[in-house]
Amino acid sequence: PRPVDAGLTLNERVSQYKLLGEAMQDMGVDIIWFETFPEFNVLEPVVKQLKARKDTPVMVSFCVNQFGYSNCGFSARALLSAAVNSDVDCVGLNCGVGPYHMLQLLKKLDIDCGKPVSIMPNAGYPKFTQSRLVFNDNKEGFIDKIQDIAALGADIIGGCCGTNPEYIRQIKESVKKGDIVKAA
């Protein structure tokens, strides 16, 4: 979502996301991924229209805080449930929290929902340093928690704010080595 969304009506926001999605379909993208959303009511009509137009896979990912709520007050459980019960092809959570809090949230949710689940936490929590938001480098701790997240059943794992190509490379290496074993 864009910061200017706050000044638009629901119908205006839906209309803009439909235009963006249709443009992506017309360009021939393989997947349309709406990420870091605090609510699903904006996306549901967008997804319906896009799926009726072409069968481009659509992923939706929500941003929640360490308590499991979006900045619009929706719980992670409610957001994921709404998306699972729609035409969305893949659901998930990204941003908002570091890997520890993401893992704690996922332990309270049933992510075995019949659709692929994507989980991409931030590298941690940024600190304001010299007029910039900076994330501490903690790849080992991040990878350790990502392994636990994958073991809970996440189908797609990665990183959001504060991660970089080296984090993703280390996730890939961890998967290749077989360090990730899904829970039974």
Language-model-derived ranges and their functions:
Residues 1-184:
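Domain-level signal for soluble alpha/beta catalytic cores
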